[in-house]
């Protein structure tokens, strides 16, 4: 018997899954009564849907007066109509996790943007500035969020410096001009940080967060490790990619170029993240590059589950449980092994049956022989026959 589950939207009740203290019963649709069936479908908000005889509704959707309890069994009345349903809109409105995530995103955006404005206005009055150019071509036309984190070494004594960070967003294969964002960074001997937020016409958002305890010039001079972390979130695949790059070189370098190809975004084009860092006692030159063979890249994919995907997963789970031969984790070899085992059991049962029939026939022949020789009385023959009949019944 196939396990029953409720066919109502956003109802995941099924037989055997619920708690023991809850008693659920499932009732088929009234396919023979069209007027009553229309009322059922109208209350379910599925007027155009045609149910089958293998689909049911659970008792949670019926009021207590719609059920008739007899001998401890709940029967559905002939005039009962389900009236208790929770629509997807209600579930989305009552979902606390989605509300919390939306509020958190709004708070983060509100905190990030004012800090960027204050830092930009403060650094414009300073005189000593270092320029860092970052050219980021978009990996996907529907890129939602991108963030970069630069962590230099431990704090040391040094001079106060101001860094200018210029971010150029270049849209490839589009007719729109390039968009440029200039953000100034104030850097102190202690701890300096900056936040900036940028949005263009295509809702492309780039957020940069930097926490520095000394200048890039000093970090290159001490030949320490420079870490760059980039997070991407793309709408079509609902995936979050994290890339961490660590480079440590013995000699001062002029530029470092990082190439990253993201296969999860279903695109064959290569997205390039270029980070240019000025070296000691030299001016930045666009034509000079140094290979970054010691750089390591770590990609982490995090799936974001949505209520729609949960429903799809639940449907596939029910399908796999009900139809075990359609399960994806079973291959043909496993099924053939099961078939061979069943065939071997069948042949073994056939052999046992033949042996039992042979014994019965030999006993019948012995009884006939004894009758012919008059070695048995009628009473003894009846006893033996009764014994044979009981033996046959037990074997069957």
Curated annotation (Swiss-Prot):
Keywords: Cell cycle, Coiled coil, DNA-binding, Metal-binding, Nucleus, Repressor, Transcription, Transcription regulation, Zinc, Zinc-finger
Pfam family, one: THAP
Biased amino acid composition, Basic and acidic residues: 91-113
Gene Ontology molecular-function annotations: DNA binding; zinc ion binding
This protein's GO CC annotations: nucleus
Coiled-coil boundaries: 349-382
Chain spans, region Disordered: 86-113
Segments forming THAP-type zinc fingers: 2-85
Sequence motif: HCFC1-binding motif (HBM), positions: 322-325
Predominant location: nucleus
Protein's job: Has sequence-specific DNA-binding activity and can function as transcriptional repressor (in vitro). May be a regulator of cell cycle: THAP5 overexpression in human cell lines causes cell cycle arrest at G2/M phase.
PANTHER family, alphabetized: AGAP005574-PA, THAP DOMAIN-CONTAINING PROTEIN 5
UniProt protein name: THAP domain-containing protein 5
């Amino acid at each position: 018997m196939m396990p029953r589950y409720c066919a109502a939207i956003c109802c995941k009740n099924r037989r055997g899954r619920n708690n023991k203290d809850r008693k659920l019963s499932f009732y088929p649709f009234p396919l023979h009564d069209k007027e009553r069936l229309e009322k059922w479908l109208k209350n379910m908000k599925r007027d155009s849907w045609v149910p089958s005889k293998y689909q049911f509704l659970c008792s949670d959707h019926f009021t207590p007066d719609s059920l008739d309890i007899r001998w401890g069994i709940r029967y559905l009345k002939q005039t009962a109509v389900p009236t208790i349903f929770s629509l997807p809109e209600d579930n989305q409105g009552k979902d606390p996790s989605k509300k919390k995530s939306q509020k958190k995103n709004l708070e983060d955006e509100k905190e990030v943007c004012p800090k960027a404005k204050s830092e930009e206005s403060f650094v414009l009055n300073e005189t000593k500035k270092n320029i860092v150019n970052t050219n980021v071509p978009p990996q996907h036309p529907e890129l939602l969020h991108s963030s970069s984190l630069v962590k230099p070494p431990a704090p040391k004594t040094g001079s106060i410096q101001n860094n200018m960070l210029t971010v150029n967003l270049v849209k490839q294969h589009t007719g729109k001009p390039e968009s440029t964002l200039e953000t100034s960074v104030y850097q102190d001997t202690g701890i300096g940080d900056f936040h900036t937020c940028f949005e263009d016409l295509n809702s492309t958002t780039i957020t940069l967060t930097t926490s520095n305890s000394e200048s890039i010039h000093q970090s290159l001079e001490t030949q320490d490790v420079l870490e760059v972390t980039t997070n991407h979130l793309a709408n079509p695949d609902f995936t979050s990619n994290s890339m961490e790059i660590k480079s440590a070189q013995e000699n001062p370098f002029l530029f470092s170029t990082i190439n990253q190809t993201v296969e999860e975004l279903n695109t064959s084009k290569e997205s390039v993240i270029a980070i240019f860092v000025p070296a000691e006692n030299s001016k930045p030159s666009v034509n000079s590059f140094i290979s970054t063979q010691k750089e390591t890249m770590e990609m982490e994919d995090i799936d974001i589950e949505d209520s729609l995907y949960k429903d799809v997963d639940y449907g596939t789970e029910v399908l796999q449980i009900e139809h075990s031969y359609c399960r994806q984790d079973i291959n043909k070899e496993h099924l053939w092994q099961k078939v061979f085992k069943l065939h071997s059991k069948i042949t073994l049962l056939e052999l046992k049956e033949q042996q039992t029939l042979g014994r019965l026939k030999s006993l019948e022949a012995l009884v006939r022989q004894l009758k012919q020789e008059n070695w048995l009385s009628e009473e003894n023959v009846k006893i033996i026959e009764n014994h044979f009949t009981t033996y046959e019944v037990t074997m069957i």
